[in-house]
């Protein structure tokens, strides 16, 4: 429930700030369920959590509430976020006349997910802003983590996202280059071959003590290095000489090459000596002329490690910009978990709606422009940021709403038979603001599907039609009697308005939600005109993308409310 609690906390704080410290539970409840229809089935829990949070914050000063909301969801502090002037993103130390060169450097272990999108988008944004160059560098020097299909999948994902790549570099094609610079480091006395057991070296490093290998001469190290390259020795690594008493033990003589006997998907068994990230990244960032590098603040230690290599070669370092962690709640992002689940048939593929892959978001109906904008809005702040699905959905809605026809959809349908009502044909607008979309026709004959639970002896209003009174309920069939047409009567009786589908000509429809669940139901007859990849809005349900049209069923993916 922690994710639900975070969602509720945002709206309680927003409401409390709006009403000067006097939050309205009913208004908060309506807002939450309206924005998050999946929570309707947990309305009781939601109500309880709202009450708990209101009690928790009742003595919190408004300025503290505002600070809390600013950290959780800054977009909720202003009811008109579009009117807030955003600071334009800029790069530091852009040299006049020198082209900006940047890189996006994923590991090809699977397709891209939402976490990758931040780096991809921001690098693309700056490369375009400064008329620079963006290199896609596929860092595949760990054969165990490479998925062969990912090389092309990543390119496809970037193209869909609107990221323009100027050049593609594959690190496994560059192993001889890394060997050349490994040789130079050994020749300069800055690196050595180490055959210590891992546990032995770990203990020495923890105590700031060098291992015996560190004092081997250059000639001996070159001999051992050549044996590594010629497959004549095993169980060794090449380490970079740093400060053996450095305050951070991980920086003390860290490894830059290791032996890996796993065949590589691209090169097979041709190579078995592979550079570690800090060596290959340093060499590539220099040789490829990187001017600016964007990466997470979890790489700050790696930047310090790489500085040793740049300094040993006398190279100028790029401008490194470290941004905070992007916390993404909800979908599965672990590539290993996704891959394993696909193999075990737990998931349907890399576009399973439970995933946070770009392919999954595309299948749900999230537009690339919406993702791009959300990442630019987040920017390169050093503070950790929680990803706002509300913002993404709001931007996406702005994009798809104008083309989304409206239809009724009845989930988990129940049959409602109404006595005493005339056969009536009604025509509803296919879109509230697009007259050219025309109308859709519903023919009421007293036999309809609904999804609501109704009560005996209670009045209800069929949307755009009649008032009825329920007489009895037998099994899954509800029997009611026509009462009147006047909407005022429904209002006076506080009649709930329910949407409906004529049983005759109803279109069997399945909506697959973000949990991968199949919601079965019926849509109105005119729904049959839709095409694959169309967006529609099921009234009082949400936006969906049309995924498949069969002879006996239309399958949709739930996009958002």
From Swiss-Prot:
It is an enzyme of class 6 (ligase). InterPro entries: aa-tRNA-synth_I_CS (IPR001412), Gln/Glu-tRNA_Ligase (IPR050132), Glu-tRNA-synth_arc/euk (IPR004526), Glu/Gln-tRNA-synth (IPR000924), Glu/Gln-tRNA-synth_Ib_cat-dom (IPR020058), Glu/Gln-tRNA-synth_Ib_codon-bd (IPR020059), Rbsml_bL25/Gln-tRNA_synth_N (IPR020056), Ribosomal_bL25/Gln-tRNA_synth (IPR011035). GO terms for molecular function: ATP binding; glutamate-tRNA ligase activity. The keyword Transmembrane does not apply. It is found in: Cytoplasm. Its EC number is 6.1.1.17. Signal peptide: none annotated. Keywords: Aminoacyl-tRNA synthetase, ATP-binding, Cytoplasm, Ligase, Nucleotide-binding, Protein biosynthesis. One of its GO terms (cellular component) is protein-containing complex. It comes from the Archaea. A motif ('HIGH' region) lies at residues 106-116. One of its GO terms (biological process) is glutamyl-tRNA aminoacylation. It catalyses: tRNA(Glu) + L-glutamate + ATP = L-glutamyl-tRNA(Glu) + AMP + diphosphate. HAMAP family: Glu_tRNA_synth_type2. Catalyzes the attachment of glutamate to tRNA(Glu) in a two-step reaction: glutamate is first activated by ATP to form Glu-AMP and then transferred to the acceptor end of tRNA(Glu). Belongs to the class-I aminoacyl-tRNA synthetase family. Glutamate--tRNA ligase type 2 subfamily. This is Glutamate--tRNA ligase. It comes from Methanococcus aeolicus (strain ATCC BAA-1280 / DSM 17508 / OCM 812 / Nankai-3).
């Amino acid at each position: 429930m922690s994710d639900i609690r975070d969602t509720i906390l945002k709206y309680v704080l927003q409401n409390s700030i709006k009403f000067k410290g006097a939050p309205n539970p009913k208004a908060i409840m309506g807002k939450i369920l309206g924005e998050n229809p999946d929570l309707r089935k947990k309305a009781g829990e939601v109500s309880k959590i709202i009450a708990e949070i209101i009690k928790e914050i009742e003595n919190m000063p408004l300025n503290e509430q505002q600070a809390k909301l600013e950290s959780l969801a800054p977009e909720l502090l202003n009811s008109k976020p579009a009117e807030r002037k955003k600071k334009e993103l800029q790069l530091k130390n852009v040299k006049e006349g020198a082209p900006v060169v940047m890189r996006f450097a994923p590991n090809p272990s699977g397709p891209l997910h939402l976490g990758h999108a931040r780096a991809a988008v921001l690098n693309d944004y700056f490369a375009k802003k400064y008329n620079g160059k963006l290199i896609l560098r596929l860092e595949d020097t760990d054969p165990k983590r490479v998925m062969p299909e990912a090389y092309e999948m990543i390119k496809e994902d970037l193209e869909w996202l609107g990221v323009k790549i100027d050049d593609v570099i594959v690190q496994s094609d560059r192993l001889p280059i890394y060997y050349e610079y490994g040789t130079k480091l050994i020749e300069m006395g800055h690196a050595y071959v180490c055959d210590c057991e891992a546990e032995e070296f770990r203990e020495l490093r923890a105590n700031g003590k060098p291992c015996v290998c560190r004092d081997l001469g250059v000639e001996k190290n070159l001999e051992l290095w050549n044996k590594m390259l010629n497959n004549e020795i095993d169980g060794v690594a090449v380490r970079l000489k740093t400060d053996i008493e450095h305050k951070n033990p991980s920086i003390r003589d860290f490894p830059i090459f290791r032996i890996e006997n796993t065949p590589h998907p691209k090169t097979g068994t041709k190579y078995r000596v592979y550079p570690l990230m800090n060596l290959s990244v340093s060499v590539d960032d220099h040789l490829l002329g990187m001017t600016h590098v964007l990466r997470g603040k979890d790489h700050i230690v790696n930047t310090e490690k790489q500085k040793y290599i740049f300094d040993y070669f006398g190279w100028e370092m790029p401008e490194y910009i470290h941004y905070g962690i992007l916390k993404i709640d909800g979908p599965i992002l672990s590539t290993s978990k996704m891959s394993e689940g696909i193999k075990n048939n737990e998931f349907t593929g890399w576009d399973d709606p439970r995933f946070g892959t770009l392919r999954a978001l595309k299948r749900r109906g999230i537009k690339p422009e919406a993702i791009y904008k959300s990442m630019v809005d987040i920017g390169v702040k050093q503070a950790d940021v929680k990803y706002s699905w509300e913002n993404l959905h709001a931007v996406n809605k702005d994009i798809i709403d104008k083309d989304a026809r409206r239809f009724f959809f009845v989930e988990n349908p129940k049959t409602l038979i109404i006595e005493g009502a005339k056969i009536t044909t009604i025509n509803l607008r296919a879109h509230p603001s697009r007259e050219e979309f025309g109308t859709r026709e519903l023919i009421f004959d007293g036999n309809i599907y609904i999804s609501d639970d109704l009560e005996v002896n209670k009045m209800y209003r069929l949307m755009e039609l009649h008032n009825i009174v329920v007489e009895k309920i037998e099994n899954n069939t509800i029997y009611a009697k026509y009462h009147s047409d006047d909407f005022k009567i429904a209002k006076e009786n506080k009649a709930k308005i329910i949407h409906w589908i004529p049983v005759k000509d109803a279109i069997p429809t399945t909506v697959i939600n973000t949990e991968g669940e199949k919601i079965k139901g019926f849509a109105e007859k005119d729904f049959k005109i839709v095409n694959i990849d169309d967006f529609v809005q099921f009234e009082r349900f949400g936006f969906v993308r049309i995924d498949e049209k069969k002879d006996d069923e239309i399958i949709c993916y739930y996009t958002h409310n």
